[in-house]
Structure formats: C-alpha cells, structure tokens
Amino acid sequence: MNAPLPMNAAAQGARPTLAELEARDAFAARHIGPDSAEQQHMLKVLGFESRAALIDAVVPAAIRRRDGMSLGEFTAPLTEEAALGRLRALAGKNRVLKSFIGQGYYNTLTPGVILRNIFENPAWYTAYTPYQPEISQGRLEAMLNFQQMITDLTGLDIANASMLDEGTAAAEAMTLLQRVNKHASNTFYVAEDVLPQTLEVVRTRALPLGIEVKVGPAADAAQAHAFGVLLQYPGVNGDVADYRAIAEAVHASGGRVVAAADLLALTLIAAPGEWGADVTVGNSQRFGVPLGFGGPHAGYMAVKDEFKRSMPGRLVGVTIDAQGNKAYRLALQTREQHIRREKATSNICTAQVLLAVMASMYAVYHGPQGLKRIAQRVHRLTATLAAGLKTLGHTPLNATFFDTLTLETGFNTDAFHASATARGINLRHVDATRIGISFDETASRDDVIALWEIFAHGKAVPDFDTIEASVQDGFPATLARQSAYLTHPVFNTHHAEHEMLRYLRALADKDLALDRTMIPLGSCTMKLNATSEMIPVTWPEFSNIHPFAPLDQTVGYREMIDQLEAMLCAATGYAAVSLQPNAGSQGEYAGLLIIHAYHASRGESHRDICLIPSSAHGTNPASAQMAGMKVVVVACDENGNVDLADLAKKAEQHSKNLAAIMITYPSTHGVFEQGVQQICDIVHKHGGQVYVDGANMNAMVGVAAPGQFGGDVSHLNLHKTFCIPHGGGGPGVGPVAVGAHLADFLPNQDSVGYRRDENGIGGVSAAPFGSASILPISWMYIAMMGSAGLTAATENAILTANYVARRLSPHFPVLYTGQHGLVAHECILDLRPLQKATGISNEDVAKRLMDYGFHAPTMSFPVPGTLMIEPTESEALHELDRFIDAMIAIRGEIARVEDGSFDREDNPLKHAPHTAAVVVSDKWNHKYTREEAAYPVASLRTQKYWPPVGRADNVYGDRNLFCSCVPLSEYAED
C-alpha cells in the first residue's frame, strides 16, 4: 500500500502505458504521510524488512485479524472524484424543503465570511482542545466571546464553552441541581411544553440515577416539591409565559429552576436570569449554524455564580502570562471528569467548540442591533401570519408567541401537510389534529402568503400590507426585554466584512493547528482531515435538512447512514452500530446503558459493578457512575498491563453483581496487552460484559477487531480514527457498536418517532442520528481508503510510533513497551528522572516545544510527569524527524542544566515559550541568549511561529476567576 503515485515509470524514463496515464491517484497515498521509501527507512531503523513483519511483532497473534476486513462494495477504494460522485448521488436523494418545523431547530443564514473563514478553514477545524493555552489564544478568545454572549442573553452570571446539544444540557442541569440542592426530594419536574426530544434525554439520564421525572403543567411546578424544575421559554407550542410567579413559588418550596431558552427570542423577551432562573440551557444553532439533520450544534449552559464549580464542560477564563499580560486559559479544570473520575457527575469532555465559535461570530458580525432586527423581523412575520390566519378562521391556540404558532386543524391535518409539502414547505406534525409553524430568519412575506393560501380553504387571502400594518407584539409588554446585552466592544466593532475577515484571521494566526504542524498528542489521533472528506458537509442536501423532516425527504441521508454503520461493523467486528451519540463520552454512556438493559432483560438488573483498570481515562469511571454503576478499580502491574490476578480476584468477589469491565485496547499505556482475551474470558465467566473503549482504534482497523477477540460493546471516536476533525474541542461523533446479543438495546428517540427496537434504551442525544451532517466525512474516508488502505493506515500509525520511540529512547526513557520492546500507535516518555535531577518538568518541555513550532504531546496522562506521543500515519518522515530533532535538541538543553552551563531556574525551558515581544525587548536579563530562546534550530529562521503570550499563570487564573470578555480598558493598557 502507499505505492508511488502514477507517472513513476515516466519519472524513471520508461514510457508509461495508457492504463498508467489513465489511472487516478490513490487517495491512500495522499492520506498516509510516509511514502514507500520513507517507510522502508523507518523499518530499517527498527530492524524489520516489512510492515507485515513489524505488525506480527507488535500485535498478539491470537487476536490478529485474518479475514481481510471486507467492506462489501467499498472493499476496493474509490478515487476522490468517484467517492464525491457516489456521495453526491446519495445527497441527491434528499429533498431540501423549507422547514418551518421548529422544535428547537431552525433554518439560518450562515454569513459567508464565517462559513469560509471558520467552518471551511483548517486553521479552525483541525485544532485540538486548548489545553496548551499559549498556542490557543485565538480560539480561546472566540470561546470567551461565546460565554459572554450566553451570559448576556440569559442574564446569568457565568456560562461554559458549549454543551453537546440542548437535550444533553438539560440533563446535565438536572444532575447539577440534584448535586447542589440539598433538597429532600428526588423529583425533577418537567413542564409539559418542553421540547419532546429534551424530555426523552432527561428521562434517559434520570433512570439509572434513580431520579423521578414528573411531567405536568408549568403552573403546578411548585406543588411537586421537586429539587428542580425545567421550563421551556418559549414553550414548544409557542407560548411565551411569564414565569416570575412560578419561579418564586418553586424557590419558596426549596427547589431550583432551569430555563430552556431560545437565544434569538431573548433579544426581545426578558432574560431568564431576570425572572428567577438559576440555570439556563439551550441550543445556539439558529445563530448561523446549519440544520445538518440534527447536528452538530453547540448547546449552552449558564448558571448563577454559586454553581460555577459544579458546572459541567469546559470553562474559559482570563489570567495573566509570565510577563503580566492578559491571557486566556481553560479554568477550574480540577472539577472536570478526567480528574474527578468516579466522583464525577458528568462525563462531558470538550463539546462543540467549532460550532460555538461560529455562533459567537454570528453575534460578533451582526451585533446586538443586528440580532434584534432579525428577531423583530421573525416576530413581525409571525404576528402577521397569525393575524391573517385569524381572518381565515384559524385562530392559533397559543395566545402569546415569539416565532411559533400552533393551529387546531380538526382532521384535515394530513391534507394541510400535503398542501404545504407541494409548495416546498414542511410544518410540524404536533398530533392528529394540530399543526405547528415556526418562523426563522429565512422566512419572508412570500412565505406568509403561501401559508395563508394553504389554510384558506379556497377563501381569498387577506392583503399582506393591510394585515401587517395593524399587528401587535405577540407577548405582553411586561415580558419585553429592558436590559442591554452584547455591550462589549467585540460585538460592536466587526460589522463590515473586511473588519470581520481580519478579526478572524488575527485570531487564527495566534493558534497552532494541523495546517501548520503535526500535533503529537497521545490518545488523540490528530491525523489528516482531507479536504475531499470535508467538502460534502456544506452541500445543501446535507446541511439544510431538518432532523424531523419527513422520511421521504431524507432517503439519501439514511442510505449513507446505513452504509456507514455497515462500514463500522466491518471495521470493529460487531453486529450493529448506532450513530446517535454525538461524542465519545456519550458513546461510552450509551454502551453502559445498553449493558444494563441487557442484564435487566435477563432478570439481572442487580448487576451494577463495573470493573475499571487504574490506568483508564477519566471518562470511563465518570460514565459508569452516570449509568448507575458502582466502580471497582482493578490494579495494573509495573508494565502498565491489567493485573490478571487482581482482576480474577475482584471478578470472583463481585460475581453475582458484576455488570461489566471497561478496558481500553491497545491500552492507555500504548501497548497491545497479551492477556486481553484472558481479561474477556474472566469477565464473561462471571456473567459480565466486556466494554472495549475505542479511543485507540487507530491501532486496530484491519489488524484486530474488538468484536472478534471478546468485546461485547465499544464506542468509536469518528473524530479520531475516522477523520472527523477535532474542531478545537468538538464536534465529535461517538458511535456505539455492539455484538448481536446487544443489538436490540441500541438507542431510540421515541419522542420524534425514531425507534430501532422496542427494547432500545432512550435517546442519549436530542437528534436521532446525533451530529449527522459530519458523518459524510467518515463515509468519504472509508470509501476512499478501502480495506487495504485502512489496514495500511493502521500499520503506518504503528510504524511511525515505533520509529519515534526508537529514535527518542536514547534520550528519554520509553516508559512502557509490549513484546519485543515495541509500542502500539503511541509511546510514553518518562521525564520524572530528569525532573528529579534538574528540576525540568514535562510542562517545561511542553512549553519549550512551542518555541520550536510544535504543539506539545499529551502531558501527565496516563502517568504524571510523562509525555505521551501519537504521531499518526499522516505525518511524513520529514515532519517526524523535525519533531524528533526538536525533542533531542531540548534534551540537549536539559543536559546543559545538568552540567551547569544553564542555570537551573533561568534557562530557556523554565521561561518558555518566548514571545516576539520578549525577544525584541530592550530589557533582556536572562542567562541565555535571545537566539537560544527564539531560534534553537536553524530551520526556524525560515518558518517561525511566535506564541502570542508567555506562559499562562494557572494559579492566578483560578484564584481570580473571570470568564467574560475583557473590558476595553484592558486592551488600552496592552
């Protein structure tokens, strides 16, 4: 695989055949970075003659895949052009109608400057979560803008940097209130007019936690004596209710209030924080993010200040750098799941950063007046529609409204829907006798007239201008918003496109993403996100489809989804896949709920013990806790492998109640454990199920399959193994794959009519197919690689990791290796001995790498004081060597600390990264030169990345928590 590109014969002087000239470039040769010669060079360094020989030495023979991994019609790879053509044909089977369905999803107009310069820009979509703040200042600022936008519009004190969707945000709000409110009740009360998909996600979350969800009129909320109450604002049927008295009564009963609020409506109606909401959640989709058949979209959560340390997800804060300048960073990280582990109450990692950035920039571009004008237009058209419908004998059931009307249609509902569809319009099917209409920023007076004609029954429609001139607001004046919002200069400056374009460019220039350099983060798989894979995402046939559109309008989507599910089954060896989970954390959670449902179906619902190795990622114990399981930790031996004796002991001890074990394979230590089948056998012997975390699947596709060596269920990370970009912290897709015996329990979304099986668990995401619009990325990758290409990618991922480990091992100890001293697809460098000898920490090395133009490897996971490196198959030998040379040079700098030629405190590592401002300053008091600081290797003279800030002060940032946009005065001081 990865043979030289066509024309090789001609390049050597031979006359190419016509067949060679007609051959299109194989995509695998574009995706896999090292060419054949470079692969042979690396193999020679490792002492192997072929990739096959290397894989034989790395992967245990007992689990090696020998079946060729048939992908059916996609076994042979398609060219980029052919794959795009095949997918275009599927997209053409979808029908794009104007959807006035609403129910939390709306048509929107994405400004071209945002579409081209964020959504389609690899500087934004190939970045990783901003754990290294010094090289992430651009998107941290954009995320802070999002937080400011949310706090302003909701009237609350602090917001996080996005949630997975509105349903998940509401479920997280429920568990947050249960945690912080010491109320005797175990009841969460949900108003009957919440979005139905939100209610289902809340119920799914509540069930394993023993929370009772009661549904009823909002007016009865206080009588429920619940610890929390969820109110929709406006309601799903359009009502804009005054909740002040209800919120006061709930508070008097000891409860707390969650508002699920529409951001555009909040530009006109009173903010939830002003009428008593303690938490506000929702979706920012209508701020410029396409429908996408349900996602990805950035949910949000805002809370009162007293709840900030209990809030899930990422939180961006302001701090200072080493020179005292302002800087942004992720704040309060000690509350997150990867640190709290089984004590966590949420497993949310990063969520939907790319989409949050888009939504925030929509607000930046339009500004407060622009948003208000859009909202006023939507509301005016809705009011005009309502007034005209009244003249035609259709008085809306909701007396108040912002953008949504609900009509009683008797038994003519189907006829009205058919008439609307014939005009290219989708309406909401409420039930057999009611129809909903929700307007958005794409609505026009022509749409109003068309809807009048649909409901006219042959009557003459009224004159638009006459009706419009007399309409009044659809909500009471007492609910009209009085408070200002989006007053910060960032929302009042960049309205001209040139200004917006340059602002986005300035932010992107501050960051390091894959468009500039390799990102060698272990356990993150920062591989190529090929342009051809990204192109279909913005096709209208994929991006402009409502998630609840009629089935006959989404035929192409469903065929593509069916094909992708089959591809993933082939890759994993499992029998069935659900694409609903919209993050790896949600895939984990779904998998454990499936295991619980399976045990319950066999009369063994008492099985609630989840065994988890001590080396596991923090999401594993957090997910187990969310699924209602009790975590029992299994020890690992000195080589990082699961201690089989300890496993056997604990499996025996908990045999009657054993639900599952969660293992990662290859292990989080970067090796293929020899005893994985024994692990599976031990757990199965005691009635448990085996959950194989798919975070490291990039080391197994085509080589080994968890569904074949003993796994019962896995989640995958399409944003790792299957090329969906990380987006700076989302979006992601975390499909859950299961064996045949678990297939009946895959998630439904009954609230919107999506049911796989009557035994399926409830919805874990708001939309039936989660982040559907980015699924074409993985479809394209698999179709273009084919079976052999995917296998070659895996083999090269293992090859590059071992090459890096071998070349760096004389300089840094490689902490764990498998058989024959080899690693899987990543390696861990142990810096603890160096820190003990010199005081130089893994953080110092990480920050120094920025001066060399690199993103740091993963720090202190899974072992404190280490760096974990995953180079992936997409990096060419030149880039691998550039990184290796940088690490060796840094080791040389550490040696100078050891021998005393560098001061232990005043050296280039302790003061890294070095900004341009520091290097050119008249003041230079360091005991090393400016050249040693800025240009440690000669190659940097021709291509140099300058970090925009010095080392961020984490302690200062958490002690002086500030999570809103910096006042203008601060910019003046800079």
Curated annotation (Swiss-Prot):
Known EC number: 1.4.4.2
Cross-referenced CDD domains: GDC-P (cd00613)
Required cofactor names: pyridoxal 5'-phosphate
Protein name stated in the entry: Glycine dehydrogenase (decarboxylating)
N6-(pyridoxal phosphate)lysine modified-residue sites: 720
Keyword Oxidoreductase included in the entry's annotation: yes
Main EC class the enzyme belongs to: oxidoreductase
